[in-house]
Swiss-Prot record:
Binding site for substrate: R148, H178, E179, Y180, R250, D251, M252, K253
Protein name: Probable hydroxyacylglutathione hydrolase glo2
Keyword Signal applies: no
Gene Ontology MF terms: hydroxyacylglutathione hydrolase activity; metal ion binding
Principal cellular location given in the protein's record: cytoplasm
Length: 256
């Protein structure tokens, strides 16, 4: 069953977070992903509900950090019947899906993919229908980048990006938790050069928002954190061991 996704930009100019509405086209049943800033998301929810464009039933939380889960309790005060999916450490959570557990939003299939590293409760949500695929990656995968290893290490991030997410179909559209693409692409350009990365840099010059425009297949071509085996990336960090490459890339990005 088909679906559509509506990004909501929060804390624009500071945190530059995204919440997302995931709506089943047939039933209008909707989940909202990481609605951390109620002031930004509640008016959108109310307007779309009044127009009968959505039937909000779920919150999907990618991890427990305040700028992702901190709005859950406030949202619940307005919409107390919502089911809140996420890690057990996240505010307001009523259900923690197991790794690779499948559930439905309306008639749309969603799979919870545990990707511990940025936090140990990080979950990506893979959405699929016969016609298209998408994944909400929180602070695990950013466009041409990845999250900091606050609660994990390079080995965990390598597994999350290059085993779990890389195994998704290449046409899976990515929806990260922040708008960091311009700075990520700038850093990536100091590591290696590909035609796809050049196009991404150009895209950022003309588009303030980049979420929903790129895919897992694109990430494999312009994200150095997903190109650990590429000779140019290995040369940039001085190692060919994938875990060491991942760690050095993250250290370099942190210092950039």
């Amino acid at each position: 069953m088909s679906f559509h996704i509506t990004p909501i930009w929060m804390w624009k100019g500071t945190g530059n977070n995204y919440a997302y509405l995931l709506t089943c086209d047939k039933t209008k049943i909707t989940a909202i992903v990481d609605p951390a800033e109620p002031e930004s998301v509640i008016p959108v929810i109310k307007e779309k509900t009044a127009k009968k464009e959505i039937d909000l039933q779920y919150i999907l939380t990618t991890h427990h950090h305040y700028d992702h889960a901190g709005g859950n309790e406030d949202i619940l005060s307005y919409f107390p019947s919502l089911k809140v999916y996420g890690g057990k450490n996240a505010s307001g959570v009523t259900y923690t899906p197991k790794d690779k557990e499948i559930f439905k939003v309306g008639e749309v299939q969603v799979e919870a993919l545990h990707t511990p590293c940025h936090t140990q409760d990080s979950i990506c949500y893979y959405v699929s229908s016969p016609s298209k695929r998408a994944v909400f990656t929180g602070d695990t995968l950013f466009t041409s980048g990845c999250g900091r290893f606050f609660e994990g290490d390079a080995k965990q991030m390598d597994y999350a990006l290059n085993h779990v997410l890389a195994a998704l179909p290449d046409d899976t559209v990515t929806y990260p938790g922040h708008e960091y693409t311009k700075s990520n692409a700038k850093f990536s350009s100091t590591i290696f050069s590909t035609p796809e990365l050049t196009k991404l840099v150009d895209f950022c010059k003309n588009h303030e928002s980049t979420t929903g425009h790129f895919t897992i297949g694109d990430e494999k071509k312009f994200n150095p954190f997903m190109c650990l085996g590429l000779e140019s990336v290995q040369k940039a960090v001085g190692s060919s061991d994938p875990i060491t490459v991942m760690k050095k890339l993250r250290d370099m990005k942190n210092a950039a």
